[in-house]
Amino acid sequence: MSIRIAQYKGKSFVSRVIKKITRGEYSHTAIMLDDNRIVEAWEGCDEVRIITDLSDGHKPGTPVDIYEVSMGSRQEGNFREFVEAQVGKEYDYLGLLGFYFNSGLHNEEKWFCSELFAASCLHADVGLLNNVAAYQTSPRLASVSPKTKYIKSIVTV
């Protein structure tokens, strides 16, 4: 069994700033559940939300790489349960500042995109990277984990 994530190569000003600060090609991470729902901590709506299309709220023409993380059925159930419990929680702007200042700034009741993915993996007993806390996980780090496997690329419409 596995879960998938969508790694966006955003084009907006905010996306370019995120890519510069995190020194990577990705500006956003969304979690793709197996029932065609997509969960993302999205600064555009200030919360963790559910969408049904990878293009929802994203600029047309944005490249998106899809990655997969293998896990057992119990792990996948724990992952999904944790992700769904976070829907509606606020966006973690303080956590983004933590990347800029290279500090541990974050709020444990709020999420930014890749932090939510990493925390969900940890909740399911799937560590993405050794010695890296969820709040330290950028979209770039999520994609270079030995647990993530590139599947394909798409472009938003």
What are these regions (language model features)?
Residues 6-70, 96-105:
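Glycine-rich catalytic cores of cysteine/serine-nucleophile enzymes that process amide/ester linkages
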Residues 60-61, 72-95:
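A structural motif
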